[in-house]
Amino acid sequence: MKKGINRVVLVGTGAVGCSYAYCMINQAVAEEFVLVDVNEAKAEGEAMDLSHAVPFAPAPTRVWKGSYEDCKDADLVVITAGLPQKPGETRLDLVEKNAKIFKQIVRSIMDSGFDGIFLIATNPVDILTYVTWKESGLPKERVIGSGTTLDSARFRYMLGEYFNIGPHNIHAYIIGEHGDTELPVWSHVSVGIQKLQTLLEKDNTYNQEDLDKIFINVRDAAYHIIERKGATYYGIGMSLLRVTKAILNDENSVLTVSAYLEGQYGQKDVYIGVPAVLNRGGVREILEVELSEDEELKFDHSVQVLKETMAPVL
């Protein structure tokens, strides 16, 4: 790794990977950006196309089609490779197929001498982040999944639409599995400086029934998009960009990534979406918010589903 030069390697040049790559070049987040794919011609074509966007970016990025050997000097390796979710298929349905692919990818990356941070986006992301941690042997804080960052963004966007407040001023988190058992932390939602419960009590224009419908739309958003256009990629591309910036810029920002629990929230030995502080070292710490009794039960259920699903592939 050259001094002052950030290198990011992207493994997987499908729709998600390329959406992320475009975001990275557009905002000039890293000085070096490497694309790796089993389809080398695709990776080369994407690198060529992206490099032609560099003159319009705020700062130069060197982009090229590389190999796993390029991971040796990488600060961050982002994996989006794997089989995509099909219409009617849950993220957990993908587990056995993508776990096998992942084990091979991670071994190849580690054989290069890689000693940076992993960021995983392939579904089921919580389980594949765990697989990456196990296969890599890296410290838990340097293996991170995209978790519920996108779900939390969808949540804030839809709540913002409902309350007619910009999403940057909606403070709300989705935690748990990135999938069907995720849950909203209603007890800690605030709109601007007002707690959600206070707002509901003050203004009968708003009600919990509407809010519950909003969460269902958040949870099922991927299904709705896949039914209409076949895949989701812009939202997750921006989510990965946000996590990347938090890490490379040493921001100490709080994002709901998939992080390893060892006692937090009463759970152990699982990667799952929780609020975590991210900086140049990866996950600095996991923030434990006090959950309501109902939220605690739902979170425990989410953990249980993940553990049962990943048992056969470990």
Swiss-Prot record:
First-tier enzyme category under EC: oxidoreductase
**Is rRNA-binding included in the keywords of this UniProt record?**
no
Which Gene Ontology terms of cellular component type are present? cytoplasm
Superkingdom of origin organism = Bacteria
Name the active site residues.
H178 (proton acceptor)
Task: Give the keywords, sorted.
Answer: Allosteric enzyme, Cytoplasm, NAD, Oxidoreductase, Phosphoprotein
Where in or outside the cell it occurs: the entry states: Cytoplasm
Q: Which reaction does it catalyse?
A: (S)-lactate + NAD(+) = pyruvate + NADH + H(+)
EC number(s) given by UniProt: 1.1.1.27
| Residues reported in the UniProt entry to bind beta-D-fructose 1,6-bisphosphate | R156, H171
Q: How is its activity regulated?
A: Allosterically activated by fructose 1,6-bisphosphate (FBP).
Signal peptide extent? none
One function term, GO molecular function aspect: L-lactate dehydrogenase activity
GO BP terms: glycolytic process; lactate metabolic process
Question: Which annotated residues bind NAD(+)?
Answer: V16, D37, K42, Y68, G82, L83, A121, T122, N123, S146
Classification via InterPro entries: L-lactate/malate_DH (IPR001557), L-lactate_DH (IPR011304), L-lactate_DH_AS (IPR018177), Lactate/malate_DH_C (IPR022383), Lactate/malate_DH_N (IPR001236), Lactate_DH/Glyco_Ohase_4_C (IPR015955), NAD(P)-bd_dom_sf (IPR036291)
Phosphotyrosine PTM positions: Y223
| Database matches in NCBIfam families | L-LDH-NAD, PRK00066.1, PRK06223.1
Q: Which family does it belong to?
A: Belongs to the LDH/MDH superfamily. LDH family.
Q: Quaternary state and partners of this protein?
A: Homotetramer.
The protein, known as: L-lactate dehydrogenase 1
Q: What is the lineage of its organism?
A: Bacteria, Bacillati, Bacillota, Bacilli, Bacillales
